[in-house]
Structures are given as structure tokens and as C-alpha cells.
Amino acid sequence: VLDLGCGSGILAIAALALGASRAVGVDIDPKAADVAFESAALNGIGADRLSVYAGDVLSDKKLAARLGPGQNRVVLANIVADVIIPLSAKAGEFMTPDGVFLTSGVIDGREDEVRAALEANGFAVVKHLERGGWHAFRGERR
């Protein structure tokens, strides 16, 4: 599992708690790694199962190479549409051929843009959920 924009690491930690063997998080905020490791420790998860990196996967090729190109069955991004849209062009590089890109954090009025970006970047949107003005998408590689 790869969590793009991991923040506190909550999605990666949840994935590990639900059975993922390993998770990797990345965030542009250098403080996110410390927070994610602290959150993981509080949930009994060690650094042997969770890795977290600071940086921008859109501009840092070395970081992108460290994130396991072609190795992640699931890529997560719970972040604003302005970030998900450009990430949709990059997410497929990190995924296995049968990979899934789960996005959330999209506010009302931006869902069509996110769907279009996912579809333009090789994802079939197989599920779209909306609750309380927030949208989430499940994109599968075509």
C-alpha cells in the first residue's frame, strides 16, 4: 500500500491493521514522518511494516524511485482535488497492473474534474461515493 499525502499516516495504519503486510507513506511536510511513526507506534505498528518519506513525488525522481514503481496493489490519496488531479498522472507508475487508486477528500463541485483526470490517466472509475459534500473514487487501471 502506498499512501500519497499521508499526513498522520492514518490511511496507511488502517491498511496495515486491516491486513496489508507493508505500507509506505509520503508527504511534502517533513514533520509528517514523525507524526506518522508516532501514530503507528500508538497502534502497535513498527518501522518494519511502515516507511514514510518526505518530498514531492511529482518533482522528485529519486523519491519516486524509492516508492516502489510498479509494486503497489493499492495507492491511496486523501487530499484536495488540486493535488489529486496531478497525482492521477503519476499514481499508475507506482501500481501493479491490477492496481487500485483510491482517492478521497474531494469537495462538491470538483468531483467532475477529478473523475476526468482519473479517466484521462488510464483509470476506469468503478465507484464514486458522496457523503456530506465530500467525494471518493475507486479507480482501476485499464
Where are these regions (language model features)?
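A short glycine-rich, Lys/Arg-flanked "PGG" loop and its adjoining helix->strand segment in the class I
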Residues: 85-100
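A short SAM/SAH-binding and catalytic strip from SAM-dependent methyltransferases
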Residues: 73-85
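Conserved short alpha-helix immediately C-terminal to the canonical SAM/SAH-binding motif I
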Residues: 31-35, 83, 110
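ADP-ribose/adenylate-binding Rossmann-like module
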Residues: 98-111
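A short acidic, Gly/Pro-enriched loop at the edge of an enzyme's catalytic core
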Residues: 62-74
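Conserved SAM/SAH cofactor-binding pocket of Class I
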Residues: 1-57
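Core SAM-dependent methyltransferase catalytic element
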Residues: 124-126, 130-142
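Short beta->alpha hinge that forms the Motif I/post-I loop of the SAM-binding pocket
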Residues: 27-31, 79, 106
